Amino acid sequence: MSLPATFDLTPEDAQLLLAANTHLGARNVQVHQEPYVFNARPDGVHVINVGKTWEKLVLAARIIAAIPNPEDVVAISSRTYGQRAVLKFAAHTGATPIAGRFTPGSFTNYITRSFKEPRLVIVTDPRLDAQAIKEASYVNIPVIALTDLDSPSEFVDVAIPCNNRGKHSIGLIWYLLAREVLRLRGALVDRTQPWSIMPDLYFYRNPEEVEQVAEEAAAAEEGEEEEVKEEVTEGQAEATEWAEENADNVEW
């Protein structure tokens, strides 16, 4: 698929894709994913063609940008590593996020409270999000999916070949997808100008690590406050001693 020059993969984006291990696929290759295989390593891991990944990512972004109402786009991730990325993608593009368990009947049972009628569905893993893809096929909703080389591709209209198991790879794909959508909508005018949002914002963070960092920051603040109090106390004590000495030396 040939793209206009403005959509070409830049060296910076290629380095990001490689650094996040987006190109590392599975050992097994599904028949529909064979065109995306670049090579195979001696250990059996297949390498994904990053150029193909970028082409499909741009195609997906153009489809998303063509939806007039951003809320009609539903971003889904049952995988833990993709839930933060889905929420950030929805916050930046205006899409509707479903992070966590997908409630069966959300697309087909209009009686349920979580019923939705989207025009486009984006999933992180076709295997874990199979229920959403199946229901989308019942009501003729197109599906965009992040697919590994061994992922099933039934009822998937646009497959973005990538490593959909690593937290950095998943976060980076959602980040690049959001950035390209904003550029196509005109929110980011100049394509040469970098986006102010960093990819790290889309990466999964362990709640225990976040709590530990918060506790360390709170302990550091308490230590600084205690040091300030000690300095103030020492200063007051010195001032009191100086006043007493001067009072003794005063001759009335």
Curated annotation (Swiss-Prot):
CDD domains: RPS2
InterPro entries recorded: Ribosomal_uS2, Ribosomal_uS2_CS, Ribosomal_uS2_euk, Ribosomal_uS2_euk/arc, Ribosomal_uS2_flav_dom_sf
Subcellular location: Cytoplasm
PROSITE patterns: RIBOSOMAL_S2_1, RIBOSOMAL_S2_2
Region Disordered, residue ranges: 213-252
Post-translational modification: N-terminally acetylated by acetyltransferase NatA.
Listed GO biological process terms: cytoplasmic translation; endonucleolytic cleavage in ITS1 to separate SSU-rRNA from 5.8S rRNA and LSU-rRNA from tricistronic rRNA transcript (SSU-rRNA, 5.8S rRNA, LSU-rRNA); endonucleolytic cleavage to generate mature 3'-end of SSU-rRNA from (SSU-rRNA, 5.8S rRNA, LSU-rRNA); ribosomal small subunit assembly; ribosomal subunit export from nucleus
Pfam families: Ribosomal_S2
Spans through the membrane: none
Residues where N-acetylserine is found: 2
Keyword terms, alphabetized: Acetylation, Cytoplasm, Ribonucleoprotein, Ribosomal protein, Ribosome biogenesis, rRNA processing
GO molecular function: structural constituent of ribosome
Recorded GO CC terms: cytosol; cytosolic small ribosomal subunit
Description of the deletion phenotype: Reduction in growth rate, a decrease in free 40S subunits, an increase in the amount of free 60S subunits and a decrease in polysome size.
Compositional bias annotation for Acidic residues: 213-229, 241-252
Source species, domain of life: Eukaryota
Gene3D superfamilies: Glucose-6-phosphate isomerase like protein, domain 1
Annotated function: Component of the ribosome, a large ribonucleoprotein complex responsible for the synthesis of proteins in the cell. The small ribosomal subunit (SSU) binds messenger RNAs (mRNAs) and translates the encoded message by selecting cognate aminoacyl-transfer RNA (tRNA) molecules. The large subunit (LSU) contains the ribosomal catalytic site termed the peptidyl transferase center (PTC), which catalyzes the formation of peptide bonds, thereby polymerizing the amino acids delivered by tRNAs into a polypeptide chain.
Record's subunit section: Component of the small ribosomal subunit (SSU). Mature yeast ribosomes consist of a small (40S) and a large (60S) subunit. The 40S small subunit contains 1 molecule of ribosomal RNA (18S rRNA) and 33 different proteins (encoded by 57 genes). The large 60S subunit contains 3 rRNA molecules (25S, 5.8S and 5S rRNA) and 46 different proteins (encoded by 81 genes).
UniProt family annotation: Belongs to the universal ribosomal protein uS2 family.
Misc note: Present with 60900 molecules/cell in log phase SD medium.
Protein name: Small ribosomal subunit protein uS2B
Chain's gene name: RPS0B
